[in-house]
């Protein structure tokens, strides 16, 4: 792809395959010096651009913030209302199937919170509702849509892989030990 996004505390974009990058956002993290500690965080952890519209971008951070822009970064809006407060946005996905649908997965391990948090918005993140049902207490690390079936979501957790069918999650035995899944290629 010609366009590449890179996140630190700000979002950068290259329009020439990574030869040159330019910032397209302000600091999207909390930027709280009291929270930096020995291992700094407050960085962008997930970026997703809508396949329906260039410049409609969703950005999640490891300090629980989720922003969106509809104009390639000229203006940004915080869209965490309805999500868990301060929980790491481990993955944000703009749906390939339905315009305006966005999924957000959150991870609370930093706070000793091992629950599964997954939200869905049908309004580009304006409001969120929980779709956590069926996943046991296991932080969610990755969410992927099925490339052929709009009703299937794959969820990678600290205890393995789950499939969500019409928003009801089922455990999937793929022959592996319960293990942490952070990358989930779906072909």
Q: Which ranges hold each PLM region?
A:
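Beta-propeller blade termini and top-face loops
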Residues: 1-187
């Amino acid at each position: 792809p010609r366009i590449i996004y890179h996140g630190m505390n700000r979002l950068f974009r290259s329009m020439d395959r990574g030869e040159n990058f330019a910032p397209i956002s302000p600091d999207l993290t909390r930027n709280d010096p009291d929270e930096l500690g020995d291992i700094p965080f407050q960085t962008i952890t997930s970026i997703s651009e809508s396949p329906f519209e260039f410049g409609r971008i969703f950005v999640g951070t490891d300090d629980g913030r989720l922003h969106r822009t509809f104009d390639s970064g000229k203006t940004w809006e915080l869209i965490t209302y309805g999500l868990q407060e301060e929980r790491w946005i481990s993955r944000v996905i703009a749906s390939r199937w339905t315009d305006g649908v966005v999924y957000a997965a959150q991870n609370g391990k930093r706070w000793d919170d091992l629950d599964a948090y997954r939200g869905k918005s049908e309004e580009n993140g304006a409001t969120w509702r929980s779709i956590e049902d069926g996943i046991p207490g296991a932080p969610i690390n990755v969410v992927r849509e099925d490339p052929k079936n709009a009703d299937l979501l794959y969820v990678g957790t600290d205890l393995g892989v789950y499939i969500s069918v019409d928003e009801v999650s089922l455990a999937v035995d793929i022959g592996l030990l319960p293990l942490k899944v952070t990358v989930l290629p779906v072909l």
